[in-house]
Amino acid sequence: MLVLLTKRLARSLLRTKLRLAAVSAMVMVAVFAGISFAAYAHTVSGMYDEIYEDSDQGVNLPDVWVENPSGTWDANMSNSICEGISNEWPDSSLALNDCEPRLRLDGTMFLSVIEDESESEKLVPAVWHGIDEGRIDRVWIPEHDCCSGRLASSDSEIVIDQRVASGMEIELGDNVSIGAGSGRMSFTVVGIGFQSNHLYFAPEGSLFPAEPGTFATGYLSSSGLERLANISSGSSNIILIDVLGTPDYDIPTTDEDEGTDLSSLVSSIDETVSNLEDNPSLVYDRSQVFSVEILRADAEGAMLFYVPVTGMI
């Protein structure tokens, strides 16, 4: 009888220990998950602001974009738009700091792949940016192992996006074959970095990040992209406008207009450009830039949900 009671007591204690161990493990998982969610939320919330700011380490994200969706402006029209915006600047608390024409074109990267022991060429959809002065929306090459090199200065050089370089095994000094329009040329990779339009690395409008080898972006000099696309010097299809400081803007996920001054400025610039240019143009702030907005929404969502998610776990 004593032996039987001892065995039953041992089994009962074992079950109790197992339950205690299971509960302890669940608590530990919840604590570590909560710490991870909180760390991510707080990190990304401040990180993007630091990247976008006008500093030695930032890119100086534009405050207003003017886009020609149907073609390009020549150098005279590009300069006229900037002059018109400056001359017609409204009476506002926001002051114009800079206006910079920019060229951005859809194109192709020609990627060599080996399949079944034979080499073939794969066409990868791409977006190419011509960045000359680069006072606004600069290419970002952080001091980190991920990135290296310098900006493109000659018309035969290119900076490749870090996700493209890692996914396609491209290194500094490599030559890449790219195209835009009917042109196809080879460019030397002199830098590996990022750009604000592609921090969320996906084709425009796609909610899913691009798989390696399916999308490419690169940052050439203005003359390099003009040479590639065979268009005249000084051509642009985007005007970047920088306002002194960092004005508030209307956040799409709220009912309130947090950036009334900037919204009024966007309307004024839209009217100015419409008077200068017959073709329709798009004028918008950062809330309409896909990569910028989806990352902001991600950071906002992380801050809102990490506490209840941790509680549910």
What are these regions (language model features)?
Residues 2-313:
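Membrane transport/envelope proteins' first extracytoplasmic loop
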